[in-house]
Design a protein with these regions (language model features):
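Sec-dependent signal peptide recognition
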Residues: 2-9
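C2-type phospholipid-binding modules
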Residues: 332-397
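Peripheral membrane lipid-binding modules
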Residues: 275-322
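Acidic/polar, low-complexity intrinsically disordered N-terminal segments immediately downstream
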Residues: 20-240
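Solvent-exposed strand-loop boundary residues in beta-sheet-rich modules
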Residues: 272-276, 332
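C-terminal motif of bacterial Sec signal peptides marking the signal peptidase cleavage site
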Residues: 15-18
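Short amphipathic, basic-aromatic surface patches that mediate peripheral association
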Residues: 236-261
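Eukaryotic beta-sheet cores, primarily in C2 and C2-like/PH beta-sandwich modules
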Residues: 268, 302-350
Length: 397
């Protein structure tokens, strides 16, 4: 949402479905996933997992993590508990307002963690307080897959995301005598007993549809519109008939990442010329494309399920709009690049393409991209359509 930037210009070309990638020098994806650089402090996810595994986690701490991941899931995110929240507001989830954050944990995880860091790092080169500050300011989090399936307060196995799309990893479990046992952990085990995964958060800075609708009831049912076409004009002033393109439902047919990385963060992006009613060449040049985008988080338990959204993609689709540019990506980070494409309109029996750059990042998995024509949408109006590994129900109403 905040990260989007739009550049619109008039181009007499057909809609483009090609992607232009920009080459960047980057650290390896494995290093980016597993090594954290926070100021002068550098640490690994494995190091953090070992710290959590050493803690005498009991009923109160399990309840704290359960409260946090449940709150995150209720706000449309994955089952996540960021270390920022762990230190600043124990038991709070991503998107939780300060007034709704849970208080009063008798012995929060942050206290146990701080005591363990001070004990282990007392004789190390890294200052314990600097390390704690780095942890609290980082994007590291605890991810508890399938948390809703567990009602007991059994102490968890703690593991971490080793990168490289690994399907299993070493986990650590604390025995009653305080010793740490290593165990191989896979997704099947995470379904059978509590497993906390130390990984990195990539979606906390963005708002899900649930958060948008809750915080701003007047905002509507769609995504974040960055630049509205015909900016400065009174939209709908022409009195022309228009329809609204709505995403009724969404179904992901597979997971796009390893379970150790969490669920799928899917960005839905749509570029179009809203309320296009130009009658002269001069009016034609007043229009600029709009890009609507929003985040859909698909938890692993929801793969294969049809999720209802009723989200607006194009609010004012007039008879002069031929198509829109549409893309879905699964967010995997990397450097900023874009997809150059066009949204087509008809004017005086001629087709014009408005050039659009829809942002994405270099490691994103492109699920589907291309032009959605009005004829296609009307033919399959309200009927499930197949877009790569995702099924959508689109409707012009």
């Amino acid at each position: 949402m905040k990260r989007l930037m739009v550049f619109g210009c008039l181009a007499g070309a057909l809609a483009c479905a090609a992607c232009e990638r920009i080459a960047h020098s980057e650290v390896s994806q494995k290093e980016e996933e597993t090594v954290v650089r926070q100021g002068d402090v550098v640490f690994s996810l494995d190091e953090v997992a070992r710290l959590f595994a050493a803690l005498p986690v009991g009923e109160a701490q399990v309840a704290e993590v359960r409260d946090a991941v449940s709150a995150s899931a209720g706000n449309g995110y994955d089952e996540e508990y960021t270390l920022q929240n762990l230190f600043e507001a124990p038991g709070s989830g991503i998107g939780s307002a300060p007034a709704t954050r849970v208080e009063g944990y008798p012995e929060p995880l942050r206290d146990l963690l701080a005591a363990e860091v001070r004990r282990q790092y007392a004789t190390r080169a890294v200052d314990p307080e600097a390390f704690l500050d780095a942890l609290s300011e980082s994007d590291v989090q605890l991810y508890w897959p399938f948390s809703e399936d567990f009602t007991t307060d059994e102490a968890p196995i703690v593991t971490f995301n080793p990168g490289d799309n690994a399907s299993r990893n070493i986990g650590y479990i604390r025995r009653e005598d305080g010793t740490i046992e290593e165990i191989v952990v896979d997704e099947e085990m995470a379904r059978e007993r509590p497993v906390w995964v130390v990984n990195r958060n990539i979606d906390a800075e963005y708002q899900t549809l649930e958060m948008r609708r809750r915080e701003d009831p007047d905002w509507g049912q769609g995504g974040s519109i960055l630049i509205r076409s015909g900016e400065g004009q009174d939209t709908r002033a022409s009195g022309k008939d228009f329809k609204t393109l709505v995403l009724r439902s969404f179904k992901s047919k597979r997971n796009f990442d390893s379970w150790l990385a969490g669920g799928s963060e899917v960005w839905v992006k749509c570029g179009a010329i809203e309320d296009f009613t130009a009658s002269t060449e001069a009016e034609l040049r007043l229009y600029t494309p709009s890009i609507t985008d929003f985040l859909i988080v698909v938890r692993r338990k929801d793969v294969g399920k049809e999720l209802t959204f009723n989200a607006v993609l194009v609010s004012e689709w007039t008879g002069m709009l031929d198509n829109c540019a549409f893309m879905m990506v699964e967010d995997d980070g990397g450097t900023q690049t874009s997809w150059k494409c066009s949204a087509m309109v008809k004017y005086n029996s001629r087709s014009y393409g408005f050039e659009i750059e829809i942002p994405l990042r270099s490691r994103d998995d492109i699920i589907w991209r291309g032009a959605l024509t009005r004829s296609y949408i009307e033919k399959y109006n309200g009927i499930t359509g197949h877009f790569g590994d995702v099924d959508l129900v689109l409707e012009l109403i």
